[in-house]
Structure formats: structure tokens, C-alpha cells
Amino acid sequence: MSLLVVGLNHRTAPTSLLEQASVSGDDTPKVLHDLAAAAHVNEAVVLSTCNRTEIYADVETFHGGVADISDQLSRISGIDLGDLAGHLYVHHDARAVGHLFSVVCGLDSMLVGESQILGQVRGAFRTGQSAGVAGSALSGLFQAALRVGKRAHSETSIDAAGASIVAVGIRLAASSLGILSEVPAVPVAPPGGVAGELGGAAVLAAPVAEPPPLAGARVLLIGAGAVGSLAAQTARRAGATEIVIANRTPARAARVAEMHDGRAVGLTDLPHEILMADLVISSTGATGLVVDHDLVAAALPGRGGRPLVFLDLALPHDIDPGVRALPGVSLIDLEALRVALDGAQVAHDVEAVRALVSTEVAGFLDRRRAGRVAPTVVALRAHADSVVHGELARLHSRLPDLDDREWELVEGAVRRVVDKLLHAPTVRVQQLAGAPGGDSYAEALRELFDLPREVPAVVSAPDLDLVERS
């Protein structure tokens, strides 16, 4: 049995495919039970957000588990497995642990450091438990991951990494629009301090200079994920008069619009909304351009010469770089933000969390290896106790004249000899279990003492035909 994660995210798949592969809350229990019924899957948890759909599982075999989970993702998305496979990534055992720990800390998010993912992982785990599909193997993994996530968000300033990008982007955009009056800034909280709210989950606001306000500005946000929600929050606090949320999925646009007192529209409304907007912030994660040169050029004649600023927070770009050549149009992209942002501090925070994740992964794997040896030690002692019991019974029948005191001494001596013989190897195998390759010592004990094969065996990662992709 081993840990496995198979999934797709904003780095490996376009938004349209992510939407097809997403699993709603109502559908999750059925998906979980379908996974549990698969031949090679013992336990499962489904994590489905705007930017990822991942299935974490404890599986009997690597290849069988990958096949079962990939088939399930194909059924969910309605996409032929041959077409879907190129967008999937697979992580096994240690890399699966490291991936989950990175995800829950926000390192793998489109908005680095966002803490909304912590609540989403917790919810996915609880759903798996409620469905009876997340057992002891995944419970230990997810409980450890949630502890790591809490540490990352309370002991470092990783929350500020992504929030800083949004805040600085809006400050630069407001400066380009020529709006310079002062309004209250987004509250700042230190690590472990009081946080604001993003999508029902705590998120620390950016500890950066107050962004110039957007008093009187109309702001159009394209994309309703974590980045779009944070941008809406920041723009609203900066004084934006009107906030419009455009998204491929109307329900998501409506949800974010309701959170930030905005208005939801579809992507087909972009020509009119660009005509009316002062600032357009885009963060869809689409693989192609969302706003091209011709769309913007067509809107300019009706704007009366008002400046128009685009803030492109997506990678790859949502906004056609060619719009920079249009009169009165400015474009701020991630490269420009990296120059304006204190990149050294952001890099320091990210590296601090990566170091934390690395340490926690090593500790988790050590504990798991040691835990896997425990059943073997228990089986060995049970085997020894059975042998002692049988031999004492045989001895008792041959020495019926021994009184209770004499028999107690004989039994005690036999048990002490057996305990002393077993003490050194059982203690040593537990010590060695935490080291790489330590599983082999438990296997040796099972072979030498012919212990029952139902004792969980440790299967180390083989040379895999399927390359693990990030």
C-alpha cells in the first residue's frame, strides 16, 4: 500500500478543462464511493477548487492506482483519457506528501500564499471522512498537512506574498489613472494576528505601502478565483465606485460579486464592460488571450479619451501585450509588478515555507516508516508468546509435582529469556525503520520468523514506467 495523488491544476490545464473536471460538493460523495469500489484504491480524498482537481489515495499498487484514478477523472470530466492524460500529474509516496504539504501552505496556488486553500483542504478531508472513504492512512497524512499549513501561515509572512502583488498592482494602476487622494488602507495583520476574510477563509492583508485609492473608478475583474476575489476586496477598500465581475461560470461570478457588493456578468459582456471601465484586472488562468488588441481598440472611440488601465495578474497572460500601443491604454503585467514589489522579501517568505515543508515531509516519512514496523514487532512478540505458552503447557504436563511457587519461578524465567532475546532486535528494527531503506528490516523479521503475511508489508517505490510530473 502506498500514497498517490493524481490531478490537474492551473499550471497543467486550461480553465475550460478545469471546469469540466471540477467536482461539486453534492457530487463528491458519489465520486468517493466510486473510487473506493475500484480494484486498487483503499482510501480516497477529492480536492476540487477553482484551480485544481486532485485525488489523493492510499492504493494497493502504483500502476493499478494510477489507472483507477485516471479513469475516474476521465469520467468526471467527460474527456477521453488519451486526451486528458497530457494534463495530469502523478506524485507517489514522498512526492505525494510533499505536494500536499506545498498545496496546503499556498505554495502551489495561482496566488502564492493564499490561505483559502487551507480551509478547502480541511473541507475535502472532512468530506472523505464523512463518506467513510478516508481511513487511517489518509487521516494521518491530512492531519499532518493541516498542521503544516497552520504553521506556514502563522509563523511566516507567506500570506503577504500574493496579497502584495495585488496591492502593488492596484497602486500602480491608480497612479496611472492619476487618482491620488487618500482612503483607508487594507488592514495589515502580522503572522498569527487577526486576518481579514477571503471566501470565508482567513487571509492576511498585504504588509505593504497603502495602495493609492480608486475613488470614483469603475473596476472590471475578469476571473472569479482567489486572485479575483482578493483583487475585488482590495479595489473596494481602495474606494472603487463600481466593481464588475466577469467569469466563464456565472455562479462563481455571482458569488464573488455578492461578497464584494459588485455586479456579475458573463464573458460575452466584455466589449460593453471594457467600454465603461477605468481599470480592468484579469486573472483567469486561461491558456490563450482573454482580451485581444481588436477588442480594446473597438472600445476606445466610445470612451471619450478616458485613460484605460489593464492589470494582468495571469500567467500565461490574459491581456494582449499589443494593447500598450493603443492611445490612452496602459498595461501592467506580472513582470512590471516584480520590479515594483519587494521581491527579496517575498522570495524570503517562500523559501522559509519551502524549508518548513521539507522538514515536515522528512519527519512525516520517518514517523510513517516507524509506524509500519510496529505491526511486525507486535506480530513477532505475539508469535513468541504463543511459542512460550505452548512450551510451558507441555512442561507443566511433564512436571505435575511442581507447586504454584515453583511453577511461577519457571514460567518467569522462560519469559525473561524470551523477552531479552527479542529486546535488542525489536528495538533496533524500530530505530532503523526511520532511515531510508529501513522497511527492509521489518521484511527480514517477517521472513526469518515466518510471521503471518497479513501484517502490512511496506512496498517501496519501484522503478516506475510512468514518470512523475510536476
Curated annotation (Swiss-Prot):
Pathway: Porphyrin-containing compound metabolism; protoporphyrin-IX biosynthesis; 5-aminolevulinate from L-glutamyl-tRNA(Glu): step 1/2. Keywords: NADP, Oxidoreductase, Porphyrin biosynthesis. GO terms for molecular function: glutamyl-tRNA reductase activity; NADP binding. The active site is at C50. InterPro entries: 4pyrrol_synth_GluRdtase, 4pyrrol_synth_GluRdtase_dimer, 4pyrrol_synth_GluRdtase_N, GluRdtase_CS, GluRdtase_dimer_dom_sf, GluRdtase_N_sf, NAD(P)-bd_dom_sf, Shikm_DH/Glu-tRNA_Rdtase. Substrate binds at T49, C50, N51, R52, S109, E114, S115, Q116, Q120. It is an enzyme of class 1 (oxidoreductase). It comes from the Bacteria. SUPFAM superfamilies: Glutamyl tRNA-reductase catalytic, N-terminal domain, Glutamyl tRNA-reductase dimerization domain, NAD(P)-binding Rossmann-fold domains. NADP(+) binds at G223, A224, G225, A226, V227, G228. The keyword NADP applies. It catalyses: (S)-4-amino-5-oxopentanoate + tRNA(Glu) + NADP(+) = L-glutamyl-tRNA(Glu) + NADPH + H(+). Its EC number is 1.2.1.70. The record marks H99 as: Important for activity. GO terms for biological process: protoporphyrinogen IX biosynthetic process from glutamate. HAMAP family: Glu_tRNA_reductase. Belongs to the glutamyl-tRNA reductase family. Possesses an unusual extended V-shaped dimeric structure with each monomer consisting of three distinct domains arranged along a curved 'spinal' alpha-helix. The N-terminal catalytic domain specifically recognizes the glutamate moiety of the substrate. The second domain is the NADPH-binding domain, and the third C-terminal domain is responsible for dimerization. During catalysis, the active site Cys acts as a nucleophile attacking the alpha-carbonyl group of tRNA-bound glutamate with the formation of a thioester intermediate between enzyme and glutamate, and the concomitant release of tRNA(Glu). The thioester intermediate is finally reduced by direct hydride transfer from NADPH, to form the product GSA. Catalyzes the NADPH-dependent reduction of glutamyl-tRNA(Glu) to glutamate 1-semialdehyde (GSA). Homodimer. This is Glutamyl-tRNA reductase. The lineage of its organism: Bacteria, Bacillati, Actinomycetota, Actinomycetes, Frankiales.
